[in-house]
């Protein structure tokens, strides 16, 4: 059930459209199978999903790793809450790693998509500046 749809959330460098979805757990599947069935999220892979993922693999120089993956928690009552790791940085060996992207579609304007990607990364870069 969609409890909230197309809510605009404003952040320091970007805006996001957010929807909240709740549902009943089907005991036919484990909680982990249920969660994994939604990844990678279509909002960051594209459609059709399998071909879009193949193109991403062909074109992107770096693997996504944490970026666009899932972060969340499980409760003892089989509830879970997750999000997609988009505004996330990784600090490893004293280096700060940031990945950002934009939703490329048929009528995308490359300059605008590039600017959007830079704006998304700026919030994290500012945090360590």
What are these model-derived regions, one by one?
Residues 1-6:
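Metal-dependent catalytic core segments for phosphate chemistry
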């Amino acid at each position: 059930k969609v409890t909230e749809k197309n809510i605009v959330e404003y952040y320091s460098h970007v805006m996001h459209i957010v929807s909240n979805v709740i549902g009943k757990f089907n005991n036919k599947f484990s909680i982990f199978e249920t969660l994994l069935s939604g990844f990678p999220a279509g909002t960051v892979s594209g459609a059709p999903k399998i071909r879009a993922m193949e193109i991403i693999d062909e074109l992107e120089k770096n693997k996504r790793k944490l970026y666009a993956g899932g972060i969340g928690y499980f409760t003892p009552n089989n509830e879970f809450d997750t999000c997609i790791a988009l505004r996330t940085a990784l600090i490893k060996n004293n280096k700060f790693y940031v990945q950002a992207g934009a939703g490329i579609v048929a009528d995308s304007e490359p300059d605008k998509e590039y600017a959007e990607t830079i704006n998304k990364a700026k919030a994290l870069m500012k945090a360590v500046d």
